[in-house]
Amino acid sequence: MNDRSANLSMPSADTVPHPYVLEATGISKSFVQGGLNVTVLNNAQLSVRRGEKLAIVGASGSGKSTLLHVLGGLDDPSAGQVSVMGKPFTRLSERERNDLRNRALGFVYQFHHLLPEFSALDNVAMPLRIRRMSTEAARREALAVLERVGMGHRAKHRPGELSGGERQRVAIARALVTKPACVLADEPTGNLDGGTADTVFNLMLELSQTLETSFVIVTHDPELAGRCDRIMRLRDGVLHEEPPVPV
């Protein structure tokens, strides 16, 4: 392993030791739809340890994406609290929440959301540039992560010149470049063919172990979910722990 890869093994978000990187207690979320109050989340609870891989499964429309948005501070719960690295995420000011989110959380989506006019390198460097890191330093860090996900040789290519699997690898690199404690992934393999999905999922599992980064992964694929440490099913707004899948 080269020096740049070695630097990735020290997550910067672990500034204060805490048993859980992410906790949610009593999370409820309701929407008004057609004049009716629709409850999507009802007293949902979960906790995620450092380096743990948690799969969230459930029927389409059950509220899995809404749950991730609440966990990531992108949406406010109607009730309940989310804590990140032991800090009361949902009680912080918007500025404090944004700062903690940028330091402790990463995001991966089904559609990569890469900026088409920028190279893979500059897409991955973007979160660091937002932190006001110099262009040179940000690109150096970004290249190290791209090499880690097997995309160093494609760093100068734009998203339109990459395959679906390659674009998702770049998206994973972008999520990891800030060395987050936890990555929230919403159907990260849902837009990929079976073989490519398996490769990308294996990459996330490997990075979770080697970097001690937690992953909360929403997926419809029971086989992929079974390779995580734990599975929780969202049903009627409530999270239920699933029994371990036999290996």
Curated annotation (Swiss-Prot):
Domain of life: Bacteria
InterPro entries, per the entry: AAA+_ATPase (IPR003593), ABC_transporter-like_ATP-bd (IPR003439), ABC_transporter-like_CS (IPR017871), ABC_transpr_LolD-like (IPR015854), LolD_lipo_ATP-bd (IPR011924), MacB-like_ATP-bd (IPR017911), P-loop_NTPase (IPR027417)
Domain ABC transporter: 22-247
Membrane topology field: Peripheral membrane protein
Keyword annotations: ATP-binding, Cell inner membrane, Cell membrane, Membrane, Nucleotide-binding, Translocase, Transport
Pfam families hit by this protein: ABC_tran
Gene Ontology biological-process entries: lipoprotein localization to outer membrane; protein localization to outer membrane
Residue sites binding ATP per the record: 58-65
GO cellular component: plasma membrane
Database matches in PROSITE patterns: ABC_TRANSPORTER_1, ABC_TRANSPORTER_2, LOLD
EC top class, as a word: translocase
Gene Ontology terms for molecular function: ATP binding; ATP hydrolysis activity; transmembrane transporter activity
EC number: 7.6.2.-
Chief localisation class: membrane
Subcellular location as annotated: Cell inner membrane
Functional summary from the UniProt entry: Part of the ABC transporter complex LolCDE involved in the translocation of mature outer membrane-directed lipoproteins, from the inner membrane to the periplasmic chaperone, LolA. Responsible for the formation of the LolA-lipoprotein complex in an ATP-dependent manner.
NCBIfam families: LolD_lipo_ex
Family: Belongs to the ABC transporter superfamily. Lipoprotein translocase (TC 3.A.1.125) family.
SUBUNIT field: The complex is composed of two ATP-binding proteins (LolD) and two transmembrane proteins (LolC and LolE).
PANTHER family linked: IMPORT ATP-BINDING PROTEIN, LIPOPROTEIN-RELEASING SYSTEM ATP-BINDING PROTEIN LOLD
Name this protein carries in UniProt: Lipoprotein-releasing system ATP-binding protein LolD
Lineage per the UniProt record: Bacteria, Pseudomonadati, Pseudomonadota, Betaproteobacteria, Burkholderiales
Gene (UniProt): lolD
